[in-house]
């Protein structure tokens, strides 16, 4: 069994907009141009956790304390962030306008059938939507 998590579900907080804002402030670039930089950061974020952000952006943990809370439980293994999969599928999933529909791209990137993976999200509405689209999905709580 492979577990798929979306980025905000990993930290149980809307992390993506906060990270993009930090990147914009640090680089002076408009948000629109930061998508590739954020995508490039994902493997480190997955491997090292949110602490990597403090190293890159001193003061981030003070500005966004909820994104840096220690997890009460470990993640199930093996897990993949939906946006952290091999290009082009992972790249497309990151930019997909409908996050749940990006699960098909994630499964394609991993070469998995829907029954071989479980999507975990902290948002019950997205879990219900994923199930309605034929994916195995459960609510994940820290």
Annotate the PLM regions.
Residues 54-58, 62-96:
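Substrate-recognition element of Asp-dependent hydrolases with the DxDx(T/V) motif
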Residues 82-116:
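Substrate-recognition "cap/lid" segment bordering the active-site pocket of phosphatases
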Residues 13, 80-84, 121:
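Short beta-strand segments
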Residues 18, 101, 124-125:
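Short alpha-helical
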Residues 29, 77, 112, 135:
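Short glycine/serine/threonine/alanine-rich loop segments
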Residues 114-142:
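Acidic, Mg2+-coordinating phosphoryl-transfer loop and its flanking beta/alpha structural elements
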Residues 2-71:
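N-terminal helical cap/lid subdomain that shapes the substrate entry/recognition surface
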């Amino acid at each position: 069994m492979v577990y798929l998590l979306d980025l905000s579900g990993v930290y149980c907080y809307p992390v993506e907009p906060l990270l993009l804002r930090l990147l914009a402030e640090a680089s002076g670039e408009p948000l629109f141009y930061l998508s590739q930089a954020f995508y490039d950061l994902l493997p480190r974020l997955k491997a090292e956790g949110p602490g990597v952000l403090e190293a890159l952006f001193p003061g981030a943990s003070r500005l966004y304390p909820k994104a840096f809370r220690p997890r009460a439980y470990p993640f199930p293994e093996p897990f993949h962030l939906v946006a952290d999969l091999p290009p082009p599928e992972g790249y497309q999933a990151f930019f997909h306008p409908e996050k749940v529909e990006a699960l098909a791209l994630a499964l394609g990137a991993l070469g998995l059938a829907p029954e071989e993976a479980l999507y975990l999200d902290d948002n019950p509405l997205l879990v219900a939507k994923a199930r309605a689209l034929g994916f195995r999905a459960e609510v994940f709580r820290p």
